[in-house]
């Protein structure tokens, strides 16, 4: 089993590291080992803007998915306890977004954000006698449009994680709080949130890594434009390798993504409660 894991997971990572020290391309032969690719790629004038777009996209997605996922999970759990109608429908509706492929999700949101005469959101704005919005062509608005689409897609995953964590909380904690006269908001902030700390941090690690690697929905929705307003690092890697045929440059950026992912994972993990604190 270890050998199989090594072949299918470890070897590609090692090979990406190796390629980052070469001048390999998709159409060239006999690459030579050099450090110039690393320096040229990291000194690219486009890289700072792309990293900033990535920070906005990943940071906004993590915060939005965490908050909305927790909100939906709380509503579902409380609805189940009270036997409210529509709880199952809400849970199923949230999960639908998760199973929709990224390309399909991008197309759906492209139709919603379309600036054509019959674009869904702009049609609603016209009915309300409000000015239409350049959802995808304005460099200041397009990143937020991509962010909304990604939050919609990823909220379901956070909801599943938070739902499982909420169901595992000992009900006696709430019973004791009721006896002590704690309000609903006090129970939420002093019982629910502390009990969810580990689940929230693990969820943040997972959705950060998933969002950092997201490019399918963006390439369908905006193609990285207008300009480079929505070109995150994962899409930049795709463009470098498959449009510029620069395999070594893409490898350097892939290693950079790996370092960022591991760094953020270690930061999140450092806040996980120790066993004696649980």
Residue ranges of predicted features:
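A structural signal for multi-pass alpha-helical bundles of membrane permease subunits
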Residues: 1-278
